[in-house]
Amino acid sequence: GPLANLSIKLKQDFLYYWLSEEDNLILCGKLDWLEYLKEIEAVHIIDFKTSKKEENPTSLQLPIYYLLAKNCQSRPVEKLSYWYLEYDTMPTRQDLPDETESKNKVLEIGRKIKLARKLENFNCPNGKDGCLYCRDLERVSRGEGEKVSESSRHDLYFVERDKPTED
């Protein structure tokens, strides 16, 4: 498989570049794997997936990785793939995103996040009940979590789950 092939070792694990100097927005992220396609002097971005659930086709993860690879290293991006480790023996190739469209989408979201931070107004698009990704964080911010560990980079909180009701 691709892991036995040549790969690109980037100078830094965490890639970043100015998405918009005018808006003071930097795009950053970490690529799982960059396979080197020697015969065409290009790269293949592989994103390892540990979940059994397939990635949403509208996810911006691969477009973000594409922008990072395009702007943080010199070789063209020839291929993008998800590799679902639970059930695939090889990566599943995805379409290359349009660079301009990807940049515009990411920039639009970056501007919204920047404005929300400035106004301290973090409204979840899923309404007052929040979403799977922010419910626990919101509970911690309301003081409902118990801090159980602290390090220079992370704080760990325990949040008790609501017990399901029986009908």
Task: Please identify what each model-predicted range represents.
Residues G1-D167:
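RecB-family 4Fe-4S metal-dependent nuclease core
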